[in-house]
């Protein structure tokens, strides 16, 4: 019956893709986020103000402790010719980034004064500190008359929503805002002409057209607000002056600690900005770029490296080195193993091996082990001591999963991805000491765990046990399945572990891991390639089984990347998962709103696969689309695009599933895949499931056949699909 499968593949390849009008790249995102790996903050271009300041990059320290939002808003104002305005009332002339740095830059104007503002978190400190610098330039023809710069910061140190029971005092040249949450420091540079705080509300004073009045103590009150004023009257035409405010937070109320953090960042506005720029220049000096990037691609590429840097925790402690899935205020500021793996792969490719090693060291030192045994039915989850979280981590480096009515997510795909990261890191650096230091975690508690997860018999014999995998389908009631993605990552990881074993002289282990990878490859091909020569989502899904995550089979060498299975599956996804916007695809055919968005990581993985299949004409438009969209949206890459409009959706910016996927796609365009990126033609394929038999199938056709007769025959001969298995991942996060 194999000829029926070949005929179906032939018909799929020959059928034209659905005609779709393509949405043009356009702007749809307005928030500029930044971090220093400790504090995070964001500026909303539409609202023309800082709208977020958080004490941590991560969402939760532990199950009981959420990261707090410390800001309502903050912004500058100007007085020109005796006329006051808060800059929230002036449209920006431009907004974006200060060259490649993680420094937001916004330009606005009032009268003859132009304000160039810079917002950033200094990497010179590991304290939660955010800096706002304003450079005021007189663009008029005469000296500035009756002119000033204002600043207001509405932060939250109290109880409840943070506004209850605050007290602001002028102490040692700065405002201290204290409450139940701790100390918020408002440190002006240089000393202001005036410093006001509630009840002398600076917002109302400026709106009334006057100047600020000096305040010393607000008393305990709700929603207290401080502000500053600097006089710039007499500023000559063409001249500029800079002013700055450093915002810092200490939960223990330690002013001395915050003073030290401010001093490390800089003691003048010029020093604050120059040190931050110098730090970012030093970072980019350690990076490398793939050859042949266009100017737009280089801009987007560099921004992704900045995002990856800012997504990594720099706080001391067990969480140090973890990489968030997104920057806050996006809600995926959580360290998923899978997302971190894609981010780490990109760091290694870009030459940022110090950051990559910090991420790997985090994995090796994290606290895990909550999901050895047993589930509600008495069966194992992992079934053995393991080294990596089954899903993600809290900010303190402890394991976290998420549960709903179908139980927890328990995912095995991260194990293989992490092993591949380690092997790639060692290939790039020669750091075999990392392998010997963490040999137990890498070999016994990860690679051997994968080998132990292989099903011994039954319909799934030879496959990795059912799990929740990439789309987080949960554990019970049909959620866990033998997903193609997990099989592919496990093959990748076992081959990578064989390389690691070879490097430290463990030849017998290397042979054992290679044999396990080969056996798993054969089993996966036998079980997960349909008679129609397509890779299906899982063993359990016998119909409606399109899942773009199965691209791992192509990217990691379970099937020849340019064989009939690869090309037929790519074409099936291209047609069956097309989005109305006319560019990429959605992630699977489950039908939920989240599923049916366009997934940027999927687009980039498909670009890799199409290129490896010899179809650069399919790969290049995907990269070009994401690049063009990013260029119009501050070079940031989101989790999703709206399936109809192409607008940004989901969390922005994404690290592993955004920045990491884009960086790797550009590297794979110009450099061959790594040691485990492909197999010889037909490797691991059995006669009934995988490789082309050379008998004149679709990939050997010499001409361009008429498509529709073949399609009609194929439809007539293929049996009616059985009713699909209901998936359980409709409303869960993509992983």
What are these regions (language model features)?
Residues 23-73, 343, 379, 386-414, ...:
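C-terminal capping/lid segments that line or modulate ligand- or cofactor-binding pockets
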Residues 95, 143-147, 233-254:
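Short Pro-Gly-centered flexible turn/kink motifs
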Residues 22-37, 201-204, 210-211, 253-255, ...:
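Low-complexity, Ser/Thr/Pro/Gly-enriched N-terminal "stalk/linker" regions
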């Amino acid at each position: 019956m194999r000829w029926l499968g070949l005929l179906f593949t032939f018909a799929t390849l020959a059928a034209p893709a659905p005609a779709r009008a393509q949405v043009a790249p356009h702007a749809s995102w307005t928030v500029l986020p930044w971090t220093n790996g400790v504090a995070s903050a964001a500026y909303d271009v539409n609202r023309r103000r800082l709208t977020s300041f958080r004490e941590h990059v991560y969402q939760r320290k532990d199950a009981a402790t959420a990261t707090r939002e410390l800001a309502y808003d903050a912004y500058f104002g100007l007085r020109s010719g005796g006329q006051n305005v808060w800059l929230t009332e002036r449209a920006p002339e431009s907004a974006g980034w200060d060259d490649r740095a993680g420094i937001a830059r916004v330009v606005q104007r009032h009268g003859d004064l132009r304000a160039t503002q810079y917002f950033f978190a200094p990497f010179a400190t590991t304290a939660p500190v955010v800096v706002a610098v304003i450079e005021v330039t007189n663009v008029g023809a005469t000296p500035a008359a009756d002119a000033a710069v204002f600043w207001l910061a509405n932060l939250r140190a109290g109880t409840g929503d943070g506004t209850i029971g605050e007290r602001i005092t002028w102490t040692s040249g700065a405002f201290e805002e204290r409450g139940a949450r701790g100390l918020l420091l408002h440190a002006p540079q240089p000393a202001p002409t005036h410093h006001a705080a509630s009840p002398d509300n600076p917002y109302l004073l400026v709106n009334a057209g006057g100047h600020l009045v000096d305040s010393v103590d607000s008393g305990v009150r709700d929603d207290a607000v401080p502000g500053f004023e600097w006089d710039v009257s007499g500023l000559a035409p063409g001249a500029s002056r800079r002013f700055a405010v450093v915002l810092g937070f200490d939960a223990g109320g330690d002013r001395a600690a915050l003073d030290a953090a401010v001093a490390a960042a800089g003691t003048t506005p010029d020093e604050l900005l120059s040190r931050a720029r110098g730090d970012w220049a030093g970072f980019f000096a350690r990076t490398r770029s793939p050859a042949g990037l266009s100017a737009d691609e280089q801009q987007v590429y560099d921004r992704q490296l900045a995002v990856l840097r800012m997504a990594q925790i720099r706080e001391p402690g067990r969480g140090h080195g973890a990489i968030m899935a997104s920057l806050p205020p996006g809600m995926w500021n959580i360290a998923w193993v899978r997302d971190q793996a894609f981010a780490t792969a990109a760091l290694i490719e870009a030459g940022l091996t110090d950051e990559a090693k910090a991420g790997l060291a985090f994995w090796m030192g994290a606290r895990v082990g909550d999901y050895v045994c047993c589930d509600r039915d008495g069966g194992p989850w992992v079934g053995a001591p393991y080294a990596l979280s089954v899903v993600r981590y809290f900010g303190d480096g402890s394991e976290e999963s998420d549960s709903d009515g179908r139980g927890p997510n328990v995912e095995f795909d991260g194990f293989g991805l992490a092993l591949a990261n380690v092997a790639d890191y060692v290939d790039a650096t020669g750091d075999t000491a990392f392998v010997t230091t963490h040999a137990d975690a890498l070999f016994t508690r990860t690679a051997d765990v994968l080998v132990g997860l292989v099903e011994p018999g039954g319909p799934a014999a030879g496959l990795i046990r059912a799990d929740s995998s990439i789309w987080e389908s949960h554990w019970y009631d049909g959620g866990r399945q033998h997903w193609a993605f997990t099989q592919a990552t496990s093959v990748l990881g076992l081959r990578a572990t064989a390389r690691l074993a070879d490097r430290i002289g463990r030849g017998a282990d290397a042979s054992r891991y290679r044999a396990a990878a080969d056996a798993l490859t054969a089993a996966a091909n036998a079980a997960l390639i349909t008679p129609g020569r397509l890779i299906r989502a899982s063993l359990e899904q016998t119909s409606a089984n399109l899942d773009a995550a199965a691209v791992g089979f192509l990217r990691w060498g379970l099937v020849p990347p340019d064989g009939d299975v690869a090309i037929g599956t790519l074409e099936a996804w291209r047609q069956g998962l097309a989005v109305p916007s006319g560019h990429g695809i959605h992630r699977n055919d489950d039908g939920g709103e989240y599923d049916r968005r366009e997934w940027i990581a999927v687009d980039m993985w498909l670009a890799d696969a199409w290129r490896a299949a010899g179809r650069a004409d399919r790969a290049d438009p995907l990269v070009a689309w994401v690049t063009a969209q990013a260029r119009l949206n501050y070079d940031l890459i989101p989790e999703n695009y709206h399936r109809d409009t192409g607008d940004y959706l989901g969390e922005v910016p994404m690290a592993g599933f955004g920045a990491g996927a884009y960086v790797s796609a550009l590297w794979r365009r110009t450099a061959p895949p790594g040691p485990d990126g492909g197999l010889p033609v037909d490797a691991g394929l059995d006669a009934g499931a995988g490789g082309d038999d050379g008998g004149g199938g679709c990939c050997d056709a010499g001409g361009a056949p008429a498509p529709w007769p073949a399609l009609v025959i194929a439809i007539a001969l293929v049996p009616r699909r059985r009713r699909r298995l209901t998936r359980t991942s409709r409303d869960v996060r993509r992983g």
